[in-house]
């Protein structure tokens, strides 16, 4: 999959961030290659894939700004809830969506929100999708 569209890049960003969250000793480049070369799973020799610039922007942005993203998201949780109580896929999608909404010059906030909901549809359940929509839509309105 050498040419990635934006939706595929966002899917890959989610997968890389999820992989890094699950295995914190994994090197970033190894996480990128694990995700980007999945279609070569049966190949005898895996050919490394160049990391798309927008993928690197999203992943590095979320990892480097995680504390600020978490601080921005926390006020929108139900009373008594903490980010640590959220399912990891939900939290990763919230961080990724919020980072893109706040920092991408290429995707308007509404597009970033819609893409976050597409990730939620693929990687979480309907209840989580509704929660993610409720939280991130606050940032579109702001």
UniProtKB/Swiss-Prot annotation:
GO BP term (any one): DNA-templated transcription termination
Listed transmembrane segments: none
Keywords: RNA-binding, Transcription, Transcription antitermination, Transcription regulation
Gene3D superfamilies in the cross-refs: NusB-like
Domain of life: Bacteria
Its biological purpose: Involved in transcription antitermination. Required for transcription of ribosomal RNA (rRNA) genes. Binds specifically to the boxA antiterminator sequence of the ribosomal RNA (rrn) operons.
Entry's family note: Belongs to the NusB family.
Name this polypeptide is given: Transcription antitermination protein NusB
